[in-house]
Structures are given as structure tokens and as C-alpha cells.
């Protein structure tokens, strides 16, 4: 009996230690690296465009939110996908190589010893950004589009752009503004809820069907309303609605996305807006699931609920605003 008790105590202790250790390991894994972006000339404004996915059935009009940038030595506009789910900005190795080959004037600015571009200054709207270090991610297009008017996607613009600043996203006008403070005219019309920016994830509390949960705002999940668990997906689906299933690429890994219409609203303080769609994802790795669990994430919001609206990411003031 004593031996059995000792074994049980040892198992319990092991579970406690591994749980605590796992928590701190995941917290460390979830941390963002040092911010490498220096932004000048605030406030700055820029238009943005939508990249469509015409291969999906049905076609997706708002697959990615792209922001035009100007790279030294390149005569055509390049684009970065704006992804608040990415804690740091990066470039795509194949796209950078193609750009350097097509436009020799970019070779100095886009030199990448040890897979890192250093001290790149690029134009963003009517301002400038100095990126001290930009890692290269395997991927991108090995050839530039033949159509000179087609977007040249060279990387991801992450949430490091937001740190200590205010971002206004005007979906109706396809325009963004990065500033040091919230414009007074918009602040007067906005409903605000508290915002957290731990490890450069945009997190805030919102309610769905009366239940308040912590949500992460991820512009990289562009064509989604609410991404949640399969159980919540089944509960929130509109009765009789036909779900759609599509394959999506997530950092080089193919996942399966299940989406369906929902009658549920997203409640931000006193404001309510339709979620429109609810989604769950198949194919997440164990590490991704553990990161989600230990981050305290209750759901992930894409751009869909905010289409046609104006939102304010006031990271400096720790609040998320919906303009009425």
C-alpha cells in the first residue's frame, strides 16, 4: 500500500511539475523578439488593396490585406501582407531573390547575408520605415509577375508596426493611418474596450451569445469572421446553412478551413456587429494547439466582421475601438 501511495504521489508531482514547466515553456515560446522597426514622419497614411483567391470555390475576394511599399532601387510597387497575427515583420526569400535579379538597383538594399536583410529603409504611404533586421522566410514567388501592374508580394508586415502607436483601419475607404494618438474626431464616435498587446498579439475581450471571451485580432486570417473550436462552430452555425471547406496555406503548411454562416453578433461593449461567418481549422500542429491553449486565446477574429467599418487599434492607450 505504501509503495502504491508513493507511486501515485510521484505521478501527481510529475504532472504538476510538467504542467508548470509546460506553462512557462509555452509563455517563453509565445514571446516576440525585439522590435526592429523605426517609423518616422507620423502620422502616416496609406491605401491598402485586397488580394483575391480565385482558385477557391467559391472565390474569396478578401484573401489578404496588402500594403504597398517602395523599396530603394525598385521602379515598381512592392507589397507586404499586413498580418497582426505575426509578431514581427519578415521578407520572403524567393521573392527577394527574384527582385534582386530583375532589378540590380535593389541588390545593395536587399543584400541578405545569413538570411537577414539589414538596415532596409522603405517608404510606407507618406512615411518611412527603417527595418534594422528582417529575417528571410523560405517561400514567396521565384518569378515576378509578367504584368507590371500586378502586386509583387515580398513579405509580411507584422504587429511590430503597432507597438507604442495607434492604427486606424478604414475598411470602407481601404485606407490606414498610423499615428501617435487617436484622431479626436474618431475618438468621439468610437466605442472602446480594453486591449492587451502581450508578445505583440492584439487581444481584447468581446462577447458572443452573451459569453465574454478573449479574442485575438488577426488580419492575416483575412477572410474569416470568428475562428473557434469545432464545438463552438457547431453551436454558432446558422441552422440549415451549407458549410464550405477549403484548403489554406499557413506558413507553408496546408490546413483545412471549415466555414459556415452564423446569425451571432460580436459584442464590443454596447456595440453589436454581425460576425457573418464562423470557422474552425483542421490540421493544426500540436505546438500550435499548445500555444493557443497557454496563451488563453478564446477565439480569433479576421477582417470580415469589420468590413465597411472603421476600427482603432490604440496600442499606446491599451484600447480597441469600433467607430460608429
Per-range role (PLM):
Residues 2-324:
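Pepsin/retropepsin-fold aspartyl endopeptidases
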Amino acid at each position: 500500500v505504501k509503495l502504491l501511495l508513493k507511486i501515485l504521489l510521484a505521478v501527481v508531482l510529475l504532472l504538476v511539475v510538467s504542467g508548470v514547466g509546460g506553462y512557462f515553456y509555452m509563455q517563453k515560446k509565445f514571446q516576440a523578439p525585439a522590435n526592429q522597426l523605426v517609423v518616422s514622419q507620423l502620422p502616416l497614411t496609406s491605401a491598402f488593396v485586397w488580394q483575391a483567391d480565385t482558385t477557391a470555390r467559391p472565390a474569396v475576394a478578401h484573401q489578404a490585406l496588402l500594403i504597398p511599399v517602395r523599396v530603394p532601387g525598385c521602379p515598381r510597387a512592392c507589397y507586404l501582407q499586413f498580418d497582426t497575427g505575426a509578431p514581427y515583420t519578415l521578407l520572403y526569400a524567393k521573392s527577394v531573390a527574384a527582385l534582386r535579379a530583375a532589378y540590380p538597383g535593389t541588390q545593395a538594399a536587399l543584400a541578405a547575408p545569413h538570411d537577414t536583410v539589414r538596415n532596409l529603409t522603405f517608404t510606407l504611404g507618406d512615411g518611412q520605415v527603417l527595418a534594422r533586421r528582417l529575417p528571410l522566410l523560405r517561400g514567396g514567388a521565384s518569378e515576378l509577375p509578367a504584368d507590371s501592374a500586378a502586386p509583387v508580394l515580398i513579405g509580411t508586415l507584422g504587429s511590430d508596426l503597432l507597438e507604442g502607436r495607434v492604427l486606424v483601419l478604414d475598411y470602407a475607404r481601404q485606407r490606414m493611418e498610423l499615428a501617435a494618438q487617436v484622431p479626436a474626431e474618431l475618438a468621439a464616435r468610437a466605442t472602446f474596450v480594453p486591449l492587451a498587446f502581450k508578445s505583440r498579439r492584439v487581444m481584447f475581450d468581446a462577447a458572443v451569445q452573451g459569453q465574454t471571451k478573449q479574442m485575438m485580432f488577426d488580419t492575416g486570417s483575412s477572410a474569416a469572421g470568428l475562428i473557434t473550436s469545432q464545438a463552438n462552430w457547431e453551436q454558432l452555425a446558422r441552422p440549415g446553412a451549407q458549410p464550405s471547406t477549403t484548403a489554406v496555406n499557413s506558413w507553408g503548411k496546408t490546413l483545412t478551413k471549415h466555414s459556415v454562416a452564423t446569425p451571432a453578433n460580436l459584442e464590443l461593449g454596447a456595440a453589436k456587429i454581425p460576425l457573418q461567418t464562423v470557422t474552425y481549422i483542421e490540421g493544426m500542429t500540436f505546438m500550435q494547439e499548445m500555444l493557443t491553449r497557454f496563451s488563453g486565446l478564446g477565439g480569433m477574429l479576421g477582417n470580415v466582421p469589420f468590413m465597411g467599418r472603421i476600427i482603432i487599434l490604440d496600442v499606446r492607450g491599451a484600447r480597441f475601438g469600433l467607430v460608429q
